[in-house]
């Protein structure tokens, strides 16, 4: 359905959806800080209305293609606790990107409540087109769409990786071309304030960002998307929060663990 973001991806970067300074976290956070981009696996816990809502796992790996490096990212989101009893979610999102984090393909396999659907988007830069295919695996219904794209564009998760390379200072902003296969926009991202965020793995100095992709920009839903990135060379997405209107409210993903292969 146009303008509708899958519930879990709304929050992770889905919601998710991350910029730099020095860090004062404990040594338990990461043994050897690695500048971004580098291979990584990030683990998050989700909170909804002050209760545990589930877990997310986000990985990034390089893939050598002839003389250039491409990237592959996987996001897995699973509801937990009371939330899982109310509305079970098991989403798997896979994304391929070129060297500069230009998205080439995405695949979403989403099981949400009684729904089960698959969404594939292909970004064809030779044609400057993105093609969208959605299949409802329960009702056996399919939808397709196509939109024009620029020479380099990201999906909503790829925009997070692109943002991590920009190293914006508070008060600065950037425009990131984003497409979900049905619509293409130039999304504004603002670096707003430096803040300290406490997590299970330590305390991070971060920069808080806001990404303007809701309220009819890319997605019709009324919402606010904020991200806190570590203020260092890693630019880790320490926290991601989606604030939505009643009855959903706010969902927050907080970093629990970092692994570097």
Where are these regions (language model features)?
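Bacterial N-terminal signal peptides that target proteins for export
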Residues: 1-11
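Acidic, serine/threonine-rich low-complexity disordered tracts
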Residues: 25-125, 165-261
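Hydrophobic, well-structured mid-protein blocks that either form specific transmembrane helices
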Residues: 119-161
């Amino acid at each position: 359905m146009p303008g509708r973001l899958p519930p879990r991806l709304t929050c992770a970067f889905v919601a998710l959806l991350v910029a730099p300074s020095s860090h004062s976290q404990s040594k338990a956070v990461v043994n050897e800080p690695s500048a971004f981009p580098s291979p990584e696996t990030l683990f998050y816990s989700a909170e909804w209305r002050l209760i545990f809502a589930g877990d997310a796992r986000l990985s990034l790996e390089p893939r050598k293609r002839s003389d250039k490096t491409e990237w592959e990212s996987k996001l897995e989101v699973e509801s937990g606790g009371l939330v899982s009893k109310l509305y079970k979610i098991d989403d798997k999102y896979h994304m391929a990107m070129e060297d500069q984090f230009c998205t080439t393909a995405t695949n979403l396999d989403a099981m949400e409540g009684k729904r089960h659907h698959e969404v594939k988007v292909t970004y064809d830069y030779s044609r400057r087109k993105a093609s969208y295919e959605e299949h409802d695996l329960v009702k056996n219904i399919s939808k397709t769409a196509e939109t024009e794209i620029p020479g380099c564009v990201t999906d909503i998760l790829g925009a997070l990786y692109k943002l991590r390379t920009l190293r914006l200072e508070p008060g600065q902003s950037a425009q990131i071309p984003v497409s979900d296969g049905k619509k293409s926009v130039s999304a504004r991202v603002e670096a707003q304030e430096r803040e300290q965020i406490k997590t299970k793995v330590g305390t991070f100095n971060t920069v808080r960002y806001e990404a303007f992709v809701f309220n009819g920009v890319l997605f019709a839903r009324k919402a606010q998307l904020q991200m806190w990135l570590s203020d260092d060379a890693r630019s880790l997405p320490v926290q991601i929060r989606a604030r939505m209107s009643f009855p959903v409210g706010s969902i927050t993903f907080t970093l629990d663990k970092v692994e570097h292969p």
